[in-house]
Amino acid sequence: MFILFVCLLPFCKFKIPDKKYFLPLIGFSLSMGFGVIFFLNLSLGKATFVAPIIIGAQLAIPFAILASSIFLGEKVNIKQWSLILISFFGIFLIGYDPNLKGEIYAIFLCSISAFFYGIANVLSRYIKEIDVKFTNMIMGFIGFITILLFSIFSEGNTVSHLMNININTWLLLLHNGIVVSVIAHTSMFYLYKFYSINKVMPFYSLFPIFGLILTFFIFGEIPTLLSAIGSTIVIISVYRLQKIR
């Protein structure tokens, strides 16, 4: 989050937004900057395998569409409701895989992260009139402060932990901050200026395709039959969501 803040700060013209944007902006910043990052990293810390976490993160799509229906009044038809339920069923199948019994807690944490990601996408629609660089810069700042404070009070020795990070970890953090947060997330939130959530969010379904391929080549993870079936159900259902107009 700090990397995101530093990268976007030089490109932002600081201007206090209208009061009506205060709560949505703070909510967006806390959901995306703290909720998503915190629970996603917790889930990765508890997980033995990465692939189930990649699939679990796809729940952000149905969560976002459900939230957009409730808070924004975006129309969700019967086919979309059906596909949303099917996607949750796919996650349940993965959770019941005997080989992944130890991953249930990690998948649960990932689902919470996906929930916050969906909420963040809805809140971003409320602040779409604000420059996307500014909103993501504020999100990076608030996310950094909240995570730092949480680390100080819950873990302690935060400065010591930072000093002991090796060069490979710093490179991964730079990749996450620049490529994922600055380029990918900022670009996606920019699209909400022109398109509804149920049009943009389903393209997020491309994420597991690349993720599962990388986990195979990097970690050598081969899914079991039940996990493969559940993963296929999730990927196909969220892909079909973006085909419905």
Predicted feature residues:
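Transmembrane alpha-helices of multi-pass small-molecule transport proteins
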Residues: 1-35, 63-64, 116-120, 137-155, ...
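Specific alpha-helical transmembrane segments that line the substrate/conduction pathway
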Residues: 2, 42-73, 113, 197-216
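Hydrophobic transmembrane alpha-helices of multi-pass small-molecule transport proteins
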Residues: 4-5, 79-96, 205, 226-243
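C-terminal transmembrane-helix exit sites in multi-pass transporters
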Residues: 7-15, 60-82, 98, 209-228
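Specific transmembrane alpha-helical segments of multi-pass solute transporters/efflux pumps
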Residues: 12-57, 93, 177-195
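Membrane-interface helix termini and inter-helical loops of multi-pass transporters
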Residues: 42-46, 92-103, 154-173, 216, ...
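Hydrophobic/aromatic residues within transmembrane alpha-helices
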Residues: 43-44, 70-72, 76, 127, ...
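Glycine-/small-residue-enriched transmembrane alpha-helix faces in small-molecule transporters
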Residues: 99-126, 146-149, 214
